Amino acid sequence: MLETQISVAIRRSRRSRLVPYVTTRPNGIALSPNGKTLYVTGSDDRTVRAYDIERDGAPVNERVLISKIEGIPDGIRVDDKGNLYVAAKEIYVYSPAGKQIHSINMTEPPSNLAWGDADFGTLYVSARTFVYRVQLDAKGSVQY
């Protein structure tokens, strides 16, 4: 298997960094609310990998945070408490430690996610045929 690399631009350092990724098809990407952890979904190996972000912006300490996700992980978003929302067979919600705490059943497999509305309490979800609007008690983490 060929190693894939991801280029990540971190604002603090204003430089791009290549992040070694030990499988193919890295897909979704998100940052923790404090900007200290980078999350990347892996479509081929059905994982979420986490990287620590050093002070200079370098991603280090790659680790598999979540494995054996049912379905093919695609989009990922983080709420203001650091919980991860992973679009796969349905939307799986994980704690920052990688423990599944909830799931949101969809009528079709979701592909990507975005926080929206004035309070960022709505998760917009794209799928094959529709874009869904899911009202949540959680609030999105604005990262971009």
Locations of the language-model features?
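Blade/loop signatures of beta-propeller domains
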Residues: 1-10, 142-144
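Beta-rich, blade/repeat-based domains predominating
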Residues: 1-6, 15-40, 68-83, 87-88, ...
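Structural signal for beta-propeller blades
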Residues: 4-7, 46-48, 91-92, 131-133
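Blade-edge beta-strand/turn elements of extracellular beta-propeller
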Residues: 8-25, 52-69, 93-106
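Glycine- and Gly-Pro-enriched alpha-helical subdomains that act as flexible
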Residues: 30-51, 55-63
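Short loop/turn segments immediately following the C-termini of beta-strands
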Residues: 43, 53, 89, 128, ...
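Short loop/turn segments immediately following beta-strands, especially the blade-tip
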Residues: 51-58, 135-143
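Short glycine/proline-enriched turn or capping motifs at secondary-structure junctions
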Residues: 116-117, 121-142
